[in-house]
């Protein structure tokens, strides 16, 4: 039986630590338990939405696996901010911030209590990168477990996801559907607990965790309601103890090659643009140099081979049915696009795991494609550069039918006013909606713009109106949408200088984001521009705004970026 204990003896062994042991005896520890490795279980649990509603149950299965492998497990909670509920509200400012809070809270709890290894259970969007950031920060043997996607809904023969509800709102305001039809979509689109069903941010990050090797192969796609989800919970508990025994730590796994593989998987699935922000943050925590330029190079080599929403018609449960992430990764590996030598938490390189893995005898049925005959020839996301984004911006070209667009700027200093303009019919074909002061510092918190983007698409303007912002997008976003513009407006980026009527050029093929205004005119505007005062003078949002870096740096909170 495993008895590797790398930290817990300093907390719990010997006469001097008798007062420490008494607290664990009070919660059920036996004398034998104190000789076992102490394995923490970080549970992001909440009843504020379906995404993490069931994670306490999964934690019990993880603890079973730890016990079977010879460890002693104790669970501790961390927070959840449900992006879908706070979309388009002041609450969205807390979404990205929660990623940092989750990483910080896990660091505090597990460093304070001397755990030897741990398992992190995530669900909703920011819980996953927050947990993985904590993994590489603590660098203790650890495994990530995804809570799983909700099942898709159905309206007749039409498969529904939460994306349909957001777009139905825009369709209602445009007079394309009735209130009764909107209500029907609302009632049917989310029938179970679990995360949003398409290749949106939560499912994207789960897929990338598997591609990075920090979670077990095959564990991303089983639905939240599936018995296989519980099986993976047990196996994840065992894997954490095994990683402790083998001495495998997250920084052995999260290397440049692992991040490279994650980026390949991201582009191949046209996943959420949020993943770029999160992978940059994970790289920062791991001490790995991985920048927007790396994404730019990788994205030009990788086609989209998964027809998953919002880029295609299928949901996560459909990918699971045809073999899940392993089938996707094996296609990429056989095509020479993955770095097979990257180590995984299972103790073997990902290439060896994929070579052994055999796909189910199920046709791919249009869900997955081959690399040489892809679903879309270009990668799902393109990095844009230009005088409007000197430090880069991102465009989800896999979910856009129009890759090149030129139009006149319609400028809003915030998302709320932009949504009102769309709902009132003031946004017309040929407009480039510019939403600024919604970046990491400016909002603060870099909120997602799904309410506006879905309203644009729902109004039938998805191919005739573009949107450019220093904020973020939901993984459910589609259309001509450019986000993460850096530097942001609040930091004096060129987006702060855009005026109504300015011509903006977007070229998703060439990777260009250009403001068609002379350098002399921009300099004149800059001399007249003054930075806005902080929106908050106290509390969490004020602290975050003072610490956070720009989007091209992952929007991490570090002493180096502190404006204290």
From Swiss-Prot:
Q: PANTHER family under this entry? A: DIHYDROXY-ACID DEHYDRATASE DAD, DIHYDROXY-ACID DEHYDRATASE, MITOCHONDRIAL
* EC assignment: 4.2.1.9
Reactions that this protein is recorded to catalyse: (2R)-2,3-dihydroxy-3-methylbutanoate = 3-methyl-2-oxobutanoate + H2O; (2R,3R)-2,3-dihydroxy-3-methylpentanoate = (S)-3-methyl-2-oxopentanoate + H2O
The record's note on quaternary structure and interaction partners says:
Homodimer.
Give the matching Pfam families: ILV_EDD_C, ILVD_EDD_N
Pathway assignment: Amino-acid biosynthesis; L-isoleucine biosynthesis; L-isoleucine from 2-oxobutanoate: step 3/4; Amino-acid biosynthesis; L-valine biosynthesis; L-valine from pyruvate: step 3/4
* Residues reported in the UniProt entry to bind [2Fe-2S] cluster: 51, 124, 196
Q: Which UniProt keywords apply?
A: 2Fe-2S, Amino-acid biosynthesis, Branched-chain amino acid biosynthesis, Iron, Iron-sulfur, Lyase, Magnesium, Metal-binding
Name-wise, this protein is Dihydroxy-acid dehydratase
Kindly list the organism's lineage.
Archaea, Thermoproteota, Thermoprotei, Thermoproteales, Thermoproteaceae
Source organism of the structure: Pyrobaculum calidifontis (strain DSM 21063 / JCM 11548 / VA1)
Q: Which InterPro entries match?
A: DHAD_IlvD/Edd (IPR050165), Dihydro-acid_dehy_C (IPR042096), DihydroxyA_deHydtase (IPR004404), DiOHA_6PGluconate_deHydtase_CS (IPR020558), ILV_EDD_C (IPR056740), ILV_EDD_N (IPR000581), IlvD/EDD_N (IPR037237)
Q: How is the cofactor bound?
A: Binds 1 [2Fe-2S] cluster per subunit. This cluster acts as a Lewis acid cofactor.
- The EC category is lyase
A GO molecular-function annotation: magnesium ion binding
Q: Name one GO biological process term.
A: isoleucine biosynthetic process
What family is this protein classified in? Belongs to the IlvD/Edd family.
Q: Which Gene3D superfamilies match?
A: IlvD/EDD C-terminal domain-like
Q: What does the record give as cofactor?
A: [2Fe-2S] cluster; Mg(2+)
- Give residue numbers for the modification (N6-carboxylysine): 126
Q: What is annotated as the active site?
A: 474
Chain sites annotated for binding Mg(2+): 83, 125-126, 448
> What exactly does this protein do?
Functions in the biosynthesis of branched-chain amino acids. Catalyzes the dehydration of (2R,3R)-2,3-dihydroxy-3-methylpentanoate (2,3-dihydroxy-3-methylvalerate) into 2-oxo-3-methylpentanoate (2-oxo-3-methylvalerate) and of (2R)-2,3-dihydroxy-3-methylbutanoate (2,3-dihydroxyisovalerate) into 2-oxo-3-methylbutanoate (2-oxoisovalerate), the penultimate precursor to L-isoleucine and L-valine, respectively.
């Amino acid at each position: 039986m495993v008895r590797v204990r790398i930290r817990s003896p300093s907390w719990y062994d010997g006469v001097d630590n008798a007062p420490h042991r008494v607290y664990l005896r009070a919660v059920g520890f036996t004398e034998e338990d104190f000789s076992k490795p102490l394995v923490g279980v970080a549970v992001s649990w909440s009843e504020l939405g379906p995404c993490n509603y069931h994670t306490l149950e999964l934690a019990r299965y993880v603890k079973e696996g730890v016990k079977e492998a010879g460890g002693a497990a104790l669970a501790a909670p961390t927070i959840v901010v449900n992006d879908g509920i706070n979309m388009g509200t002041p609450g969205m400012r807390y979404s990205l911030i929660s990623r940092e809070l989750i990483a910080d809270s896990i660091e505090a709890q597990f460093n304070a209590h001397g755990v030897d290894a741990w398992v992190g259970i995530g669900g909703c969007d920011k819980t996953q990168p927050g947990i993985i950031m904590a993994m590489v920060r603590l660098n203790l043997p650890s495994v990530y477990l995804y809570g799983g996607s909700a099942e898709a809904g159905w309206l007749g023969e039409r498969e529904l996801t939460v994306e349909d509800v957001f777009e139905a709102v825009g369709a209602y305001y445009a007079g394309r559907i009735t209130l009764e039809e909107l209500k029907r979509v609302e009632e049917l689109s989310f029938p179970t607990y679990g995360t949003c069903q398409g290749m949106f941010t939560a499912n994207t990050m789960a897929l990338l965790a598997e591609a990075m090797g920090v979670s077990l192969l095959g564990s991303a796609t089983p639905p939240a309601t599936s018995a296989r989800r519980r099986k993976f919970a047990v196996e994840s508990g065992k894997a954490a103890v095994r990683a402790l025994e083998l001495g495998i730590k997250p920084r052995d796994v999260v290397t440049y090659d692992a991040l490279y593989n994650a980026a390949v998987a991201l582009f191949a699935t046209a996943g959420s643009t949020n993943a770029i922000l999160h992978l940059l943050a994970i790289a920062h925590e791991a001490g790995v140099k991985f920048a927007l330029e790396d994404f730019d190079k990788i994205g030009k080599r990788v086609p989209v081979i998964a027809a998953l929403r919002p880029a295609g018609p299928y949901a996560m449960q459909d990918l699971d049915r045809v073999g899940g992430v392993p089938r996707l990764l094996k296609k990429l590996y056989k095509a020479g696009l993955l770095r097979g030598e990257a180590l995984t938490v299972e103790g073997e390189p990902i290439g060896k795991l994929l070579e052994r893995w055999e796909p189910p005898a199920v046709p791919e049925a249009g869900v997955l494609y081959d690399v040489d005959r892809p679903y879309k020839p270009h990668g799902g996301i393109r990095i844009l550069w230009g005088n409007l984004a000197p430090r880069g911006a991102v465009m989800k070209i896999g979910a856009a039918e129009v890759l090149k667009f030129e139009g006149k700027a319609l400028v809003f200093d915030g998302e709320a006013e932009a949504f009102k303009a769309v709902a009132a019919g003031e946004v017309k074909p040929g407009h480039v909606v510019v939403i600024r002061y919604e970046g990491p510092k400016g909002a603060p918190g870099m909120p997602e713009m799904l309410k506006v983007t879905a309203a644009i698409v729902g109004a039938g303007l998805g191919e005739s109106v573009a949107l450019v912002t220093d904020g973020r997008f939901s993984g459910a976003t589609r259309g001509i949408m450019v986000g993460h513009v850096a530097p942001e407006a609040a930091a004096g980026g060129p987006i702060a200088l855009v005026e109504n009527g300015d011509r903006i050029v977007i070229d998703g093929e060439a990777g260009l984001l250009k403001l068609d205004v002379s350098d002399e005119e921009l300099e004149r505007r800059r001399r007249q521009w003054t930075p806005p005062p902080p929106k908050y003078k106290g509390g969490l949002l004020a602290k975050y705004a003072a610490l956070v870096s720009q989007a091209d740096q992952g929007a991490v909170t570090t002493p180096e970026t502190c404006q204290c």
